[in-house]
UniProtKB/Swiss-Prot annotation:
Protein's pathway: Purine metabolism; IMP biosynthesis via de novo pathway; 5-amino-1-(5-phospho-D-ribosyl)imidazole-4-carboxamide from 5-amino-1-(5-phospho-D-ribosyl)imidazole-4-carboxylate: step 1/2
Gene3D superfamilies xref list: ATP-grasp fold, B domain, Phosphorylase Kinase, domain 1
Enzyme class: ligase
Name listed for the protein in its UniProt record: Phosphoribosylaminoimidazole-succinocarboxamide synthase
Length: 241
């Protein structure tokens, strides 16, 4: 498998075409961004750590029947994935109140949200990723009712698995972001990445952040935090879920 044309440069990844028209080459970079890209820095080993965490979790979710775009990880910063037409939506799941949800609704931080909340955001840096409700999604033809039904069902299954997975290693999954796409045969798959860049994680013993909030809020070096998450996931495998 060889990469060819650079198709897209994102905040933390570069995506290339390959000599297989149905397969993409995803390169994880060391760039960290926050505040809609206003804050940027190069973080040592971040690409390797996010690739490793994403690979581990994609493999586990695939093993429990979640359709994903994952195919292979040939080196420390590369992921080979199925080519998917991405839905222009960020799916946010909130298990506990945190971030702007706290200020928006004037609730206590870490209040448990039962049932978990699904939110949808239109994926557009230019527009600041605005919130979308289901009526807006359908009216603008960003996803079909059947696709969104599948998204909700898959997201609930993924959330249940990940909450248990992280709880088993002493981490609370506060909230997280997912992205989905469709393969050329129409199959809806989980795509993008699964890492502390997209998860809000809190240590159950200390209350410390174990995610990109450390960078966003200038709480210290980010690399050791991501190393800790990976180490715990590797130490206790999926059998503990």
């Amino acid at each position: 498998m060889n990469k060819t044309t650079l198709l897209y440069t994102g905040k933390a990844k570069q995506v290339y075409a390959t000599d297989d028209p149905d397969v993409l080459w995803m390169a994880y970079t060391n760039q960290a961004t926050a505040l809609n890209g206003e804050k940027k820095a190069q973080i040592a080993h971040k690409g390797e750590l996010n690739r490793a965490i994403s690979t581990l979790l994609f493999k586990e979710l695939t093993a429990v029947g979640i359709p994903t775009h994952y195919l292979d990880s040939p080196d420390s910063t590369t992921m080979i994935v199925k080519k998917a037409a991405m839905l222009p939506l960020e799916v946010v799941v909130r298990n506990y109140a945190s971030g702007h949800f706290v200020t928006k609704f004037n609730v206590k931080p870490m209040m448990k949200l039962d049932p978990p909340i699904h939110e949808y955001y239109y994926k557009s840096d230019e527009l600041g990723d605005p919130f979308m409700n289901e009526a807006q999604i359908f009216a603008l033809h960003e996803a079909t009712p059947e696709q969104l039904k599948q998204v909700r069902a898959l997201t609930d299954r993924i959330n249940t698995y990940l909450m248990q997975r992280f709880a088993a290693i002493g981490i609370t999954l506060v909230d997280f972001k997912l992205e989905y796409g469709t393969l050329k045969d129409g199959t809806l798959v989980l795509a993008d990445e699964l890492s502390p860049d997209n998860f809000r994680l809190v240590d159950q013993q200390t209350g410390a952040s174990l995610d990109k909030d450390v960078f966003r809020q200038n709480r210290g070096p980010l690399t050791p935090v991501y190393e800790e998450v990976l180490s715990r996931l590797q130490e206790k495998g999926a059998a503990h879920v």
